[in-house]
From Swiss-Prot:
Organism: Homo sapiens (Human)
Stretches the record annotates as Disordered: 54-87, 115-243, 477-504, 524-561, 727-807, 928-1007, 1111-1134
Any single GO CC term annotated in Swiss-Prot or TrEMBL for this entry: membrane
Topology class, membrane: Single-pass membrane protein
Biased composition (Basic and acidic residues): 132-148, 954-970, 1125-1134
Function: May play a role in spermatogenesis.
Main localization of the protein described in the UniProt heading: membrane
Designated name of the protein: Spermatogenesis-associated protein 31C2
Length: 1134
């Protein structure tokens, strides 16, 4: 008391000396103190109002703001003095408040014992039930002659004193400087005084004071229930909840001296225990001290060791109760809490406590099923209902992180586990309950947190059960694996999910959209679906059991770290999922290399499958030692869609790898076989006998298509495996009109060094046809009978397949097709004005012939196009320059018998008989028809453009004879359905041979085709003055009814007329587009051979076929009236 201020000394002396102290003294003193504090509190606000500055929200924030703020410069008028005064007032205000709180604390420490024994006993709370007391009227007082030793304050053993304090009174009364603390004594003292309590029989154990340690987390204390009229004050820092069967603990006043040192042993305090319900059973002070000291030492030492380095930033574990002694907190953070006895919380207090606890995240472990008192004494272990206290949320900023850790299933920190072990030592005999009932029924948490805690505890229990099950399965290896049962670790990874859900991730190869997948692979197991139903966690091979057992070994080590391992496993699986999703995208784009499949095969070979696993999972390698990878079993963690796509990609990759090499090898073999055929004679090709034509046994080309093609469309190819020896038979077998060929050619032209045919001299013009069949344009529309019969079936719509060149044709187009049936018997008589045949190359590339035969293989009746208005003419007698046959695309089932003209010219040097007979046949036809061939100067360009696959043959032929180019252009014009009358009047005199009829629906042409035809038409119209006459649709239809009789010129003329009308339409349509290139082609027409220029035209393809209908409808009458009289007159003159 020597250090007290002067006013306080006077007050304390007067209060001690006077026998009866009235409450008004304390009221006056407190009123003055609060008035002073209120004045200092409002002083800054007044200064701010005068300075037009808004007041700060709270004293603490205002203090920090004002201390750090510097006076700003003047803004137009002098305000510096006012601000300085306000700053000074604000700085002095906290000091005044601190002094006020110090005075109050000292006053409370001085007046505490007197209030206990005197009139202010009600400030300390009601008497315990063990104390028998009566209330006396106001104004009664106690005698002041009692010894002062009895008035010493009582200190609870749990409230360990602060080392920096020197007086024991400050333990329970030292307030923090902040205004946020709560003073129970001050609040109760400011209220009207209540009747004091007097003891009729003063007991040596007066009511004890239990000062609560400030900021002590979760203190569990036991105290008697309060009286009915008592309402407990609210506590800010902690909410007191006590069990129902704890005894009240009271310390005798005479056992605790005033000079008690803060560091004295706790055993010096000898308390007395008073029973409930008025029972005054005494417990020996020594036994109580020993029990209290033992429990408190264990508790305090364990907590100090773990939390000594953490003061305000203590991390509260979600599953632990961490108590922090008073000595670990700074004096500034110690709230001023008056020493009040323990009490039972009313329902209102419980509701208030629950509201405080909802903001926190308390979790209790089974180690804290028994509550603890403030003094450190453990309550009986039979009390299973735990009521915990949680610190405010502001003291634990780490709680959201801990909550996330709980939700994510992360392992607890090591410090938390250590603390849990320490507390489990203090309560070793706890009852074992179910994991789902760990938390008490009345645990003050929100329903959401309750569910999360129950789920977390349930997961821990299931994981422990799964570990036990794993150990049991390890003792009996091979039983569950042999039967295909799920493995134990599935329950730990799936966390409660059934094995059926994991087994739904399957990939069945038999459900692949490709129906021939099983035929392609051939080695796919038949019962893959049964294997898919097996456990997806199995690894291939018998050694998979050992590897899986090795993977499960770490899981059996420690149950406390299973959550961490599970988290790591999930992380690995997530990485694998991301990797597989990235690879899946590459797989869909076709970027997976061949090494991926090799890695799969290496994995399968590394794990040999036993007989037992073959029965269950059907993963045994097939006979060809190519294991069928089950993606659902190896990659069970992937999504079903990802597994299905990946499996389909693997199957396609295998099929491609299996069939890619045979297809690459097969093509050279076919070319080699076709090379042998190129040396065969062309006698039968030029003019086969009726017997040969009728017997089509070996004429058809056998097309081999791979059975069980893989799903990839690129692998579906048709290959010619057995080409027949007789090319004409093979090309004409499917056509019944081949029987009309009964005449054999007679002439044989001479051959030069290069094996090409030489043109005969003027005397040999009789057996040389100047051009393959050139149709007369003077025939009537009623004279075409046989051709109509042949093309009558062209009404059946059939797709015209673009075909490559036919074998033995050196420069033949890929789409060359011959409609040669009725024209074979036509022979032109040996005229003196027959043009030379183009020089043909003998050499033939076998690789080119491969594509030719493939084209011929599809020349069957089922693939003819719809062409009712166009007759069909055989192309076997048409001679082509440089091996190009102006074959018209097939329009009916006669297309299979089309023979390209190149066969007749590309003969070997030693086989001249075929060409001789062919020349005789052509000359006879020319004599019967009496027409002259038109010439075509675009032969050379078209030959080069239309046959890019075979450039070397026709290039060297073009340099020798310019007539060859003209012959080619003439045959090119045969494909087009139009022909100008000017061309026919002048050029038909040269060569009127067999021309091929085009169809309206023709296969697509090459880009150079149209350009060559345009050039040809421009040259024709530049030299001619006549306009083309249109061909009526009637004339085209009547041509079908034309019958060709070998040797009759009348039928030949009629046939030529029909063909000429079609050619006129093409030429008239293309004339407008080729007017710019007329001068360039005139020179080619100026070089006649034997007095007759040679004109040939390339086939006219689909892009020009669309123009036929328009030309036929617009120029019917004009072309018909102009062309026929002139042509008939020319034919009669010859």
């Amino acid at each position: 008391m020597e250090n007290l201020p002067f006013p306080l000394k006077l007050l304390s002396a007067s209060s001690l000396n006077t026998p009866s102290s009235t409450p008004w003294v304390l009221d006056i003193f407190l009123t003055l103190v609060f008035a002073l504090g209120f004045f200092f509190l409002l002083l800054p606000y007044f200064s701010y109002l005068r300075c037009d500055n808004p007041p700060s929200p709270s004293p603490k924030k205002r203090k920090r703001h004002l201390v750090s703020q510097r006076p700003a410069g003047r803004r137009g008028r002098p305000r510096g003095r006012m601000k300085n005064h306000s700053l000074r007032a604000c700085r002095e205000c906290p000091r005044g408040l601190e002094e006020t709180w110090d005075l109050l604390s000292q006053l409370q420490s001085l007046l505490g014992p007197h209030l206990e024994k005197g009139d202010f006993g009600q400030l300390s709370g009601p008497d315990p039930p063990g104390e028998v007391g009566k209330r006396t009227p106001d104004g009664a007082s106690r005698s002041s002659h009692e010894p002062t030793e009895d008035a010493a304050p009582i200190v609870s053993p749990l409230a360990s004193p602060d080392p920096r304090t020197k007086h024991p009174q400050d333990l329970a009364s030292t307030p923090p400087p902040g205004p946020m603390t709560t003073s129970v004594s001050s609040l109760s003292a400011s209220q009207p005084p209540e009747p004091s309590l007097l003891l009729e029989h003063p007991s040596p154990e007066p009511p004890a004071l239990f000062p609560h340690p400030p900021r002590t987390p979760d203190p569990l204390a036991c105290s008697p229930p309060p009286p009915k009229g008592f309402t407990p004050p609210p506590l800010r820092d902690s909410t007191l909840l006590t069990p129902s069967h704890c005894d009240s603990v009271a310390l005798p006043l005479d056992t605790v001296p005033q000079s008690l040192s803060p560091r004295e042993d706790l055993a010096a305090s000898v308390p007395g225990i008073s029973g409930l319900g008025g029972s005054n059973s005494q417990v020996s002070a020594l036994s109580w001290s020993q029990e209290t000291t033992k429990t408190w030492c264990v508790f305090n030492s364990s907590v100090q060791q773990d939390h000594l380095s953490r003061q305000r930033d203590t991390t509260m574990s979600p599953l632990l109760f961490q108590a922090q002694p008073l000595s670990h907190l700074e004096p500034e953070s110690q709230p001023f809490i008056s020493s009040t006895p323990q009490f039972w919380p009313t329902p209102m207090a419980q509701a208030e406590a629950q509201a405080h606890l909802q903001s926190s995240f308390p979790v209790l472990s089974p180690a804290f099923l028994s509550p603890m008192k403030n003094t450190g004494v453990a309550c009986p272990a039979s009390q299973n209902k735990v009521q915990a206290l949680s610190l405010p949320e502001t003291q634990h900023p780490e709680r959201p992180l801990l909550k996330k850790q709980l939700e994510g299933g992360l392992a607890l920190p090591s410090r938390v586990q250590k603390s849990q072990d320490v507390f489990s030592v203090s309560t070793p005999n706890l009852p074992q309950e179910r994991l789902t009932s760990i938390l008490p029924e009345n645990f003050p948490v929100s329903p959401e947190l309750w569910r999360q805690l129950e789920q977390h505890m349930g997961q821990r229990g299931r994981i422990q059960e799964s570990l036990d099950l794993m150990q049991l399965q390890d003792e009996l290896p091979g039983t569950s694996q042999a039967k295909g049962k799920p493995r134990p670790w599935q329950s730990s990874t799936s966390t409660g999910e059934s094995s059926k859900e994991a087994q739904t991730v399957k990939f069945q190869l038999e459900r692949d959209p490709c129906p021939h997948l099983g035929q392609i692979l051939g080695e796919t197991p038949q019962n893959l679906s049964r294997g898919m139903e097996s456990f997806p966690g199995k690894v291939l091979g018998a050694t998979s059991e050992e590897s899986e057992r090795n993977l499960r070994k770490p899981l059996r080590s420690d149950s406390g770290s299973d959550l961490l391992r599970r988290t790591e496993r999930n992380h690995i699986e997530n990485i694998l999922k991301a990797h597989m999703s990235r690879k899946l995208g590459q797989t869909n784009e076709g970027l997976i290399p061949v090494s991926v499949r090799r890695s799969w095969l290496a994995v399968n070979q590394a794990f040999p499958v036993s007989n037992t696993h073959v029965k269950t999972s059907n993963l045994a390698a097939p006979k060809s030692r190519k294991a069928c990878v089950n993606t659902a079993q190896v990659l069970s963690f992937l999504e079903p869609c990802t597994q299905q796509v990946l499996g389909a990609h693997i199957v396609r990759f295998w099929a491609k790898h299996r069939w890619g090499l045979p297809l690459r090898v097969l093509k050279p073999i076919q070319c080699f076989q076709l090379e042998k055929v190129s040396s065969l004679s062309l006698i039968q090709l030029a003019g086969p006998s009726s017997d040969t034509c009728e017997s089509g046994a070996g004429s058809k080309v056998e097309v081999a298509t791979f059975l069980g093609e893989p799903p990839m469309a690129s692998l579906r190819k048709q290959v010619l495996t057995k080409p027949s020896v007789h090319m004409p038979e093979r090309l004409q077998a499917s056509s019944p009109a081949c029987k009309q060929f009964q005449r054999a050619p007679r002439g044989i032209p001479s051959s030069n060094d290069h094996g090409s045919l030489k043109a005969p001299t003027a005397g040999q013009e009789g057996r040389w046809p100047s051009k393959p069949l050139t149709y007369s344009l003077t025939g009537s529309t009623q004279q075409s009978r046989s051709l109509g019969a042949q093309s009558s079936r062209a009404g059946e719509t059939r797709e015209a397949v673009p075909q490559p060149t036919v074998p033995l044709g050196t420069c033949m187009r890929a789409n060359l097709q011959a409609t040669s049936e009725d024209v074979r018997g036509f022979k032109a008589p040996g005229a003196s004005k027959s043009s030379l045949l183009p020089r043909m190359s003998v050499s033939q590339d076998p690789r080119k012939l491969c594509l030719m035969e493939e084209a011929v293989s599809e020349f069957e009746p089922g693939k003819a196009t719809k062409s009712e208005t166009q007759p069909q003419v055989s192309a076997t007698v048409v001679l082509l320059p440089d091996g190009q046959a102006s074959v018209v695309p097939h329009a009916s089932e006669n297309l299979a018998s089309q023979v390209p003209q190149g066969h007749l010219q590309s003969m070997p040097t030693g086989n001249m008989q075929a060409s001789q007979e062919l020349c005789d046949l052509m000359s006879a036809r020319r004599s019967n028809m009496g027409h002259k061939e038109p010439r075509n100067p675009n032969c050379q360009g078209s030959c080069k453009s239309q046959s890019p696959m075979f450039p070397p043959t026709h290039k060297r032929e073009n340099s020798r004879k310019p007539n060859l180019e003209k012959h080619e252009e003439m045959f090119q014009g045969l494909r087009t359905p139009q022909l100008t009358p000017g061309r026919k009047t002048e050029d038909t005199r040269q060569n009127e041979g067999v021309q091929l009829l085009p169809s309206k629906k023709q296969p697509p042409s090459i880009s150079h085709f149209g350009e060559n035809i345009k050039q040809f038409f421009q040259t024709i119209f530049s030299k001619k003055e006549r306009k083309p006459a249109p061909v009526t649709a009637e004339s085209q239809k009547t041509v079908k009814n034309r019958s060709c009789v070998y040797g009759s010129s009348a039928e030949a003329e009629r046939l030529m007329t029909a063909v000429g009308q079609i050619l006129e339409e093409n030429m008239s349509l293309c004339h407008a587009r080729h007017a710019s290139k007329v001068n360039q082609q005139r020179q080619q027409f100026q070089a006649p051979v034997c007095g007759f220029p040679c004109n040939h035209r390339h086939p006219f393809y689909s892009e020009h076929s669309r123009m036929l209908s328009y030309a036929a409808s617009s120029q019917q009458a004009t072309l018909k009236n102009q062309s026929r009289p002139n042509r008939d007159r020319q034919i009669r003159d010859q």
